A protein has these predicted regions:
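Short active-site oxyanion
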Residues: 14-16, 84-85
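Active-site beta-strand termini and strand-to-loop segments that position acidic
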Residues: 54-57, 120-123, 133
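Short, Lys/Arg-enriched N-terminal segments with co-localized hydrophobic residues
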Residues: 1-8
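A short, acidic/glycine-rich surface segment
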Residues: 69-75
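Mid-chain, well-packed structural core segment of small domains
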Residues: 77-100
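Short beta->alpha transition motifs characteristic of CBS
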Residues: 111, 130-133
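Core segments of cupin and vicinal oxygen chelate
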Residues: 8-11, 17-62, 95-98, 102-110, ...
Length: 133
């Protein structure tokens, strides 16, 4: 059950936007990872060569925005820290790790074998975690 809060809702999350140098490459990476439709017609966003969207099956929309001279975060380097990260639920960490590495992700922290998550970077350098459901 979703908790009910006394304060009125001011806004609804429409999408999460990731800056990158290659909108086609990064939207393709996340499509292979999460499924969904890249650049599904949607009046909320324009689809030009500087922007792409991914409408996932779960209803979450990721957007990818081309930024000239994009400098990705370097987790855990405090000189270029992450601004956010995605936690993505998986049933089998080992199997999911194999898939994301084949897609172009980089393993940043495998952690303790008993730990329920692992940290990766997507092809543009954004950290994300695979978390055991």
């Amino acid at each position: 059950m979703v908790p009910v809060y006394a304060a009125p809702v001011i806004a609804r999350l429409q999408c999460v936007v990731l800056d990158c140098a290659d909108v086609d490459g990064l939207s393709g990476f996340y499509q292979a990872l999460l499924g969904g439709v890249v650049n599904q017609p949607d009046p909320r966003w324009s689809n030009d060569d500087s922007w792409a969207t991914l409408h996932t099956g779960s209803g979450i929309v990721l957007a990818f925005q081309r930024v000239e001279d994009h400098r990705p975060p370097r987790w855990p380097d405090p000189a270029r820290p992450q601004q956010f990260h995605l936690d993505l639920g998986v049933e089998d960490l080992d199997q999911a790790q194999q898939h994301v590495l084949k897609l172009g992700a980089t393993l940043l922290d495998a952690g303790d074998p008993k730990r329920s998550w692992r940290i990766f970077a997507d092809p543009a350098g954004h950290p994300f975690c695979l978390v055991r459901d």
